[in-house]
């Protein structure tokens, strides 16, 4: 009894609060028990003090302490009727009605009155959705920024096409807030790091020509998408086809009699997802002329770590300069598109797993690089890229995108790192041990020691089926030591295009889980959220709102968080949709199988019924014949049977049987039908009035015994068509027998 007495039960109604609000709203509309008047721009609003004080901190401070029976609160000029009317409806109905005309004023009134339980993100979303005029302002601002940003020293050219140049400039602009690049005259010359004046002059000339030639040709609609999320995706999901950002990269000489050494420099802070270096081997005539003068500047930059300055693992690589051969090619051709480019390969540096390995790997790579760069090179008299058309370029790039999208997976980190691997027993042995996972692109994927992570290592030069007019160009082939120039065989022609990797948003499979999760994690890494993306996805709606209130987040972080959650919801919805479709398909398959089995059973049943029906007809026919033989029927009985018999089976066989049984057939037939008043007619083949037909047949037939077989042959079809009338005949026979 003690347990039952101490037990307490609570009843909680889910509609009580809603009904109370509805009742209060009805009282407000009818001006019942309203004790406060709010004046907004001369317009009066009647309300209840308790409701206003509970919904707004401003009204709570104005109303509490007032003892007047009828209180009037006059709001300042900041509060307008258009902004206050939806708020008072929200206080009584918990519904806030917004439109393009009143969203700004309602937002100002909410901030001024300190209205509770209204999310600020709602206004940000609606402003972002309604106000389309901001896109034009962004275009003007971005145009102004592009003109001044070209003078910065982190030069990002594209040696393939003008659209690649536009993409690189857009990427550079979008990274301006989070990437701080050094100036060319202050930070690039530090300590023992040097840059030669000819190289700086060529770079400055390239930048000037870029700013003057491409200033009017920039397609601002393509560079300025309408929404910020598209801008963010536009700036982060494209791997730049040309960016020199390897950590502390140095250009070393490859000839023993070299007198000068060009060095790339480091020391600047930068953040780049992928560091890409293009190796240009065009304009061989210019290179040969430099060789005759005794100097052979290296067109490549091997990774070399400066002594005494080890880099931490999480440090980002600096932005460097391009190779000298590429700049000479640019100066001599005078074209931003760089028609002399022969090969593009992607090269980045893998993060070092141990601090002591920083001094061992660069020196080993440098020795192997110097050894491989001494190899023979074939001379090429013509540039194959000049014969290439823009259509072939686009086809090759689209094919590359299609192959790359199949390889990217969610298991790999969102910032994929392309790293050259060091050969152990030589380039040939390392090449034989590798496994090509994409035969056309020649992409080889190395297996990382960490479980669940895979990194792209080498993009080898491959045979492009759509570019068949490329001339073979000789260069040293070494896949394992970081040298990305290849010796082409006489039967093979290298494809010089770099693969542009799309990471999710550019692909049409937006509902796929792999691309969406990869893009979400990429944005999470870039915006630097205080919590991971998995937590954003797994939380419920209330917990998610509480989490946002606990942290002070910037608009960029809020956009990223909502984008991640939206993508996760879309992915879950797509998975559920696919599951429903699969369930429907399975149900349809089961129904089809069920209908097929039912059809087979019905066909078998029909065959069985038909066979049974044939047997039954035969049995009834035999039974009727037997009964008619045994019973001597009177003429009246025969007439009754003929009246109820069907047209398909008359009783003529009875007459024939009776005629056969008598010695004088003619007398028997005439005596049977003597009482019939039916006039003689033409003999029908089989039908009603069979008695008259039989009588006429008897009268016309000669009085011989040979007429019986002829009658039997004429009545044979009627005898075979025994149906339901046989059953009626049998029942009539039983009735006459009983009489």
Swiss-Prot record:
GO cellular component: nucleus; RNA polymerase II transcription regulator complex
Domain named bZIP: residues: 560-623
A GO MF term: DNA binding
Organ and tissue specificity: Ubiquitous.
SUPFAM superfamilies: A DNA-binding domain in eukaryotic transcription factors (SSF47454), Leucine zipper domain (SSF57959), POZ domain (SSF54695)
This protein's UniProt keywords: Activator, DNA-binding, Nucleus, Phosphoprotein, Repressor, Transcription, Transcription regulation, Ubl conjugation
Spans annotated as Leucine-zipper: 585-592
Stretches the record annotates as Basic motif: 565-581
Entry-linked SMART domains: BRLZ, BTB
PTM info: Ubiquitinated by the SCF(FBXL17) complex or by the by the SCF(FBXO22) complex, leading to its degradation by the proteasome. Under oxidative stress, reactive oxygen species covalently modify cysteine residues on the bZIP domain of BACH1 and release it from chromatin. If the BTB domain of BACH1 remains intact, its beta1-alpha6 degron is recognized by FBXO22, promoting its ubiquitination and degradation.
Biased composition (Low complexity): 699-708
GO biological process: one example: DNA repair
InterPro entries: BTB/POZ_dom, bZIP, bZIP_BACH, bZIP_Maf, bZIP_sf, SKP1/BTB/POZ_sf, TF_DNA-bd_sf, ZnFinger_BTB_dom_contain
Disulphide bonds in the chain: none
UniProt modified residues of type Phosphoserine: 196, 448
Ranges of Basic and acidic residues composition bias in the record: 346-364, 376-391
Residue stretches making up the BTB domain: 34-100
Region Disordered, annotated ranges: 287-321, 344-391, 679-708
Compartments it resides in: Nucleus
Family: Belongs to the bZIP family. CNC subfamily.
Assembly, per entry: Heterodimer of BACH1 and MAFK.
Role noted for this protein: Transcriptional regulator that acts as a repressor or activator, depending on the context. Binds to NF-E2 DNA binding sites. Plays important roles in coordinating transcription activation and repression by MAFK. Together with MAF, represses the transcription of genes under the control of the NFE2L2 oxidative stress pathway.
Name used for this protein in its record: Transcription regulator protein BACH1
Organism encoding this protein: Mus musculus
Gene name for this UniProt entry: Bach1
